[in-house]
Amino acid sequence: SASLVGSEMCIRDRLKGSADVFLYPGHVNAITGTALCESLTEEGVSGVVAGFTAKELLTALAVSLKRYQEGKPFFVNCYPRVVTAEGSKEAQRLVDELMESCDSEWRGLGVIPDSGMKLRKEWEMFDARVKYQIPEMEGRANPACRCGDVLQGKCKPSDCKVFGKVCTPKHPVGACMVSNEGACSAYFMYGV
């Protein structure tokens, strides 16, 4: 998918030197498959596909640490009960038929070319933004929030001035605190 390629390449370029291993989300790879992630090892990018339970995440982290210590780029699918090499062909077919890639703004990362998806022209009648002429909303990030730096591995959640004070799971300031899958939320809940 162009969306995955665009975002993956941009993030990889921005993270050069600051991320040793990517932890790929299982729900995305369940659709896209693992081919792109596997091919990135040829460019020196290591990664592991993980599930979402504590056991699945810990397994992915343990595999990452072990393989990283071997000193060679690697890819491992630690979520094989859901993620396959080819992904979901039917989901891919539907995405290709109905959607096209577009530039998209990522909180804390800025605009990443071809990292979003929108309905193709022939399906715009189902796009509420087009149908009801809803203007683009511009989000304003709290300048004290370091979510972008957390996402890029430049700091820990606890390094952020608003973490645990203004920004909590009940009152999130940045995307990293919004869901229980976010790095800041996990730090907050488990004291990592």
Stretch-by-stretch model annotation:
Residues 71-72, 190-192:
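Short, structured secondary-structure boundary patches
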